[in-house]
Amino acid sequence: MTTPKTLVQAAVDVNDLGLGKEIAVMAKECGADLIEVGTPLIFENGHKAIGEIKKAVGDTPVLADFKFFLTMGLAEQAAAEGADYITMLTGYNEFLIEDAIKRCADNHIIPVFYPFSKPEELCALTARMISLGATHFFNHRYAPMGDPSGQDNLAIYRSLSPEIHVTITSDVFSEAVDSARSGADCICFGRAIHTPDREACVKWIDAIHEAR
C-alpha cells in the first residue's frame, strides 16, 4: 500500500489500566495515528481495557493486540469494545484465516495478521494469505529479530504486493526510522513510552512521520 506518510502505532504495553490510559492520551496528543491496546493490558484487565482506552482517545483508531491464534469470537469481542483493528497470530489454516476475515468484515473491524512461521516460510504463507483476502500484516523488520544481516521481512512483504498494508514493530529507534524510509506503512513502538515520557514520544513520532 505504501502510504504517503508512514503512520505511527503507539503500543500501550503496561499492566495498569490507569497508567495505560495516561500513556494512550499522551501518545494521541503527541500525534500518534493509532493506539495499540497491548497484550499485557488486555491480559491483566480483560476486554474492558479496549473500551477504556477507546473512550480515552476518542476518534483516534484503536488496535486490540490479542497475540492469540485465530480464535472464534475475538473479532466480535474487540469490536464490541470499540476497536478498529485486531492483531491475530496465524499459521497454515485456510479455514481459520477465511473465517477471521469474514468475522472481522461482519463486525466492521480490520484484521492485522502476524504470520507465525519459520523465516523461510514467511513468503509462501503471506502469499497464500493475500490470495485468501488478507490485506494488513504485522511483523518485526528482521528475522532473527534485530539482526540486519538476517532476513528482511519488510522487503518480502513489499515484493509480494504493493497493495498490502505492512506494520513493522521495532523498539530500536534507528531501525524504526529506516523501516519507515524503506516502505513500511506503519511503525509500531512502545518501550520508549512504558512511562508517560512526552519528550521520547514526540521524538519517535516526529522522526517516523518525517522519514519519507
Predicted regions and their residues:
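Short, small-residue-enriched loops and turns at beta-alpha junctions
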Residues: 14-19, 39-45, 68-71, 93-95, ...
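C-terminal helical cap(s) of enzyme catalytic domains, especially alpha/beta-barrels
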Residues: 100-104, 180-181, 189-212
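Conserved N-terminal beta1-alpha1 strand-loop-helix module at the mouth
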Residues: 1-64, 68-72, 128-130, 202
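Conserved anion-binding
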Residues: 72-73, 77-163
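Hydrophobic faces of well-ordered beta-strands that scaffold small-molecule active sites
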Residues: 6-12, 35-37, 62-66, 86-88, ...
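Generic structural signal for well-ordered alpha-helices
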Residues: 21-25, 47-51, 75, 97-101, ...
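Catalytic cores of alpha/beta
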Residues: 23, 69-81, 120-131, 166, ...
